[in-house]
Amino acid sequence: MAQIDFRKKINWHRRYRSPQGVKTEHEILRIFESDRGRIINSPAIRRLQQKTQVFPLERNAAVRTRLTHSMEVQQVGRYIAKEILSRLKELKLLEAYGLDELTGPFESIVEMSCLMHDIGNPPFGHLGEAAINDWFRQRLHPEDAESQPLTDDRCSVAGLRLRDGEEPLNELRRKIRQDLCHFEGNAQGIRLVHTLMRMNLTWAQVGGILKYTRPAWWRGETPETHHYLMKKPGYYLSEEAYIARLRKELNLALYSRFPLTWIMEAADDISYCVADLEDAVEKRIFTVEQLYHHLHEAWGQHEKGSLFSLVVENAWEKSRSNSLSRSTEDQFFMYLRVNTLNKLVPYAAQRFIDNLPAIFAGTFNHALLEDASECSDLLKLYKNVAVKHVFSHPDVERLELQGYRVISGLLEIYRPLLSLSLSDFTELVEKERVKRFPIESRLFHKLSTPHRLAYVEAVSKLPSDSPEFPLWEYYYRCRLLQDYISGMTDLYAWDEYRRLMAVEQ
């Protein structure tokens, strides 16, 4: 196991226009302050205020959006980071681990990773992801590229069908089809930060949001040693070279994770579990009393002094005494949140320290809060009650189905852009309006400028005389559409769908 030295991980250099020379502690901190400014002032963060957390198209400002959720995750991440640093200081290990002059950057990377952790999520959350993947899967059929005879390939894009005698090109076709059918919010976050917004963050800051290490074009089983780290796609084919460079800059082995990402993940797990239940009460899906009974029933028999007693029962009893003349709802969730944080944050911090050799190496194949402990059981309790009583509620499911239909419908509306030949689409990109393509011209005009520029830049770097060129061009054209639609807010996607379907002006 490599020696733990965080100076080798907290890399303050950037992909472009990187600071040069040796830097003092204060100068390094200023570099990460610059990262903070770039992130907080980015439009992707602002758009989170109109993206779904649990309840799509919610008008009640007391119910969480992706932005308010991310701010809460940021605070919990900061709490865990400070707890870790405090414990390492008590153990006199800060200097030994190369952290004595990097405590500020350590905290900042965690905080900003937490704030950014959802920026790649499409409108309508997981149902939006499913809509994008299902739409492309129905047209590309990546499974047919694996074992079917070539004559049975149902891919509707002629250029991406496998062909006899073209094995090198066929392998690229397989990758592209698989990649486009595995849109994922975390992978889109990497693409947003690097390719679409060109934020030019430090290598360490980007490492903090690389939550999953599986390429989106991965086929087959994942290695047992990395099955948790690779349980979802983490980056796309379009960012393959960038991620390879990131691994080099952060001293990460293949499919390994950046150490501080575990803290961001734990902060998210702690935050959303309580928040989803609180939002459900705000939405009147159930009362606080009903929630307490749901939690009590799901936990089962327990003794005094158990974690359930110290966290949930304690919050319930204090809220009923109502000594602060506040509503029982507010009191209960205040105590539940405080009790949960006071138990889970120190536990997560200690798990990080206890497993630091594997975490530093990037190979710890678990979440910090997924083990056989009572703390893990408490999180599972919150999640299970939310799944049973919140996510399955008819109002939530109806809105999710509407969101799925909106995203599928928008992809269908923009499909003519994918149906154009390479030469015709190239002409449209160059001229922006082609008389014989009136519908396609108008659809192209609606695409946002940053997304169009990202497409043009990617295609301009390809050798146009290569046999791979048509495949890559079509890949980036599909990415253009995914980028545009996934970047919409819930409300914009809803309104755009209604306008283009002529439901309203």
Curated annotation (Swiss-Prot):
Cofactor annotation? Mg(2+)
What PROSITE patterns does its record include? HD
Q: Does the keyword Hydrolase apply?
A: yes
Looking at its record, which EC class is this enzyme?
hydrolase
GO terms classed as biological process: dGTP catabolic process
Q: Which reaction does it catalyse?
A: dGTP + H2O = 2'-deoxyguanosine + triphosphate + H(+)
Q: A single GO molecular function, which one?
A: magnesium ion binding
Domain of life of the native organism: Bacteria
Q: Which PANTHER family match?
A: DEOXYGUANOSINETRIPHOSPHATE TRIPHOSPHOHYDROLASE (PTHR11373:SF32), DEOXYNUCLEOSIDE TRIPHOSPHATE TRIPHOSPHOHYDROLASE (PTHR11373)
User: How does this protein assemble?
Assistant: Homotetramer.
Name of the protein described by the UniProt record:
Deoxyguanosinetriphosphate triphosphohydrolase
Report the source organism.
Answer: Escherichia fergusonii (strain ATCC 35469 / DSM 13698 / CCUG 18766 / IAM 14443 / JCM 21226 / LMG 7866 / NBRC 102419 / NCTC 12128 / CDC 0568-73)
> What gene is behind this protein?
dgt
